[in-house]
Amino acid sequence: MLLSACTLFAGFAQWEPAGDKIKTTWSEQVNPNEVLPEYPRPIMERTNWESLNGLWEYAIINKGAALPEVFDEQILVPFAIESALSGVGKRVSEKQELVYRRNFKILPDWKGKQVLLHFGAVDWKTDVWVNGVKVGSHTGGFTPFSFNITSALLPKGENQLLVKVWDPTDKGYQPRGKQVNKPEAIWYTPVTGIWQTVWLEPVSKKYIENLRITPDIDRRLLTVKAELSETEPGD
């Protein structure tokens, strides 16, 4: 109990909102040690999973520069770096990139499983490394994406996760809604980086990747199509 209390206090000591713009009752209840703890996907809920939300290290680098070795500051994931709840409240220009880093451990009962790394959404262009191995890239600020990181994991001990994001906001061609670098009379700001839950999930070698559910009201039918990770004749 004492250890838990100390850990909780340490988390709060390292984080506080950056300013007080657009505060709500819910923003005042944010706990850096338990950020958005609910299962993040509305379908295919699995019992075993591990949230990676919380305090991460971050650095802002020039676009195209080498990945940093030193990270001096912290950010609360999954809140965009421009937001108050990130604890940072900084802008990242189209000439810069945002790099995140954190360590994680794989639970012992996940041994022998495939491990998926999920991102609810990252704005905009994302590259991901695990233990120095690039596991994938994704372009798009609104859609979830996942990588199978099993082959990049260490057999024991801590693993390192590195995420690099580039977002040109209104200097690019991507869909961005009301995000602008100079909002003038409105409060809309750019949304750069991780802004939805990040989590790990153990699965079997064959698992359901996605479900496509199609209703037919006239015929009173519901068709469910499961997309599998690997298929063989007879599956």
Model-found features: residue ranges?
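Beta-strand-rich binding/interaction modules
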Residues: 128-130, 221-235
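Aromatic- and Gly/Pro-rich amphipathic surface segment
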Residues: 70-91
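N-terminal pre-domain segments of enzymes
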Residues: 12-49
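Short coil/turn motif common to extracellular beta-sandwich-like domains
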Residues: 112-114, 217-225
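Short beta-strand segments of immunoglobulin-like
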Residues: 210-217
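Accessory beta-strand-rich segments of carbohydrate-active enzymes
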Residues: 57-61, 90-208, 231
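Predominantly extracellular/luminal regions of secreted and cell-surface proteins
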Residues: 54-77
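Bacterial N-terminal signal peptides
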Residues: 1-7
